[in-house]
Amino acid sequence: MTDVIGESTSIDLDDKYQAEKGSFFFTGVQALVRVPLDQMRADRLAGLNTATFVSGYQGSPLGGFDMEIIRHQELMVGQNLVHRSGLNEELGATAVMGSQVSSVFPQQNYDGVLGIWYGKAPGLDRAGDAIRHAQYAGTSEHGGVLALTGDDPANKSSTLPSASEFAL
């Protein structure tokens, strides 16, 4: 008789963040958490020593993003990933902008820093000035910035119905 099940393999729930090959399943928020980890793996293969700095304002619809990073903090430490919640969206965006100017200092700890800002659409409105200045300042040679914005058109968790298309 032919064995149709195949060999037993063990699966660890942290594979979605740690495995470098193979198939694994995760939610959209978990996929966003994996993005900086994959980027830093690619950087290391290219001979770069990089880090990631994540900041934004907690709350839905992207509230699960920061909670997922915090939930798996022990995995992030070895990956040079630092998460600091902002007091508001604007301060989070300003902190991410600061991660890009590290290259101007003579003694750098990293070749580059990936900055990730997150917030919902009303927060994007609030952070607009900081984000505009960050765009003009640019990023470091081996850094970059990713902005994650969650919309709330049904006004489930915001003070007003919101969408980010126009602000972006």
PLM-predicted stretches and their roles:
Residues 1-168:
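Thiamine diphosphate
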